[in-house]
A protein has these predicted regions:
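Predominantly extracellular/luminal cell-surface or secreted proteins
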Residues: 72-76, 98-102, 112-116
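Bacterial N-terminal signal peptides that target proteins for export
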Residues: 2-14
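Residues that form or immediately flank small-molecule/cofactor binding pockets and catalytic motifs
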Residues: 44, 102-104
């Protein structure tokens, strides 16, 4: 008999909303959002899926702003080497997984999205905001993967990962 595991949303990322600038005449606001990442049913073979991370920034008035940012992800319940989803009902069980930044499925294990520690990477970039121009949008691909291995107890598994955005 096959065991089917239905992982829930892997990454429930807390979105950060920041208002920064050098004063009331030089300000901008940004919204960070993540699409849902659902890996489907796990039956022992590696599975992966992807979602989009989107950063939208709007100029608040005044002159021009040069914006540099970093988006870092927490390890969730596990650690960066191997994140872990917990079963949401009894009996307790876990399911290993990880999150990757802009990686292709064949090279997932080389781009773990974290906070820059322990060999992990974070999403970074820069752009200019000009007074009166349209908002600036930047996107990154968030990959999630469950490695091949024994299937745990059937059920819903989830983890909560916190996203932190830094403006430099």
């Amino acid at each position: 008999m096959k065991s089917y595991v239905r992982p829930g949303v892997v990454a429930r990322c807390a979105a950060a909303l920041a208002l920064l600038g050098s004063g009331p005449a030089m300000a901008f606001s940004c919204n960070l959002s993540f699409g849902s990442l659902n890996l489907g049913a796990f039956v022992g073979t590696q599975i992966s899926s992807f979602s989009q991370a989107t950063l939208v920034c709007t100029h608040g008035g005044g002159g021009n702003e040069s914006v540099s940012f970093q988006v870092r992800l927490s390890p969730g319940v596990g650690n960066y080497a191997q994140r872990q989803m917990n079963r949401t009902s009894a009996p307790a069980d876990t399911l290993p997984y990880n999150l990757y930044l802009n990686a292709l499925p064949a090279v997932l294990n080389t781009f773990v999205w974290g906070d820059g520690s322990g060999g992990t990477l974070f999403w970074s970039g820069n752009f200019n905001l000009n007074n009166g121009n349209s908002p600036v949008t930047r996107t990154a691909t968030l990959w999630g993967a469950i490695p091949a291995g024994p299937a745990p107890s059937a059920g819903v598994y989830q983890d909560t990962v916190v996203a932190t955005i830094l403006f430099l």
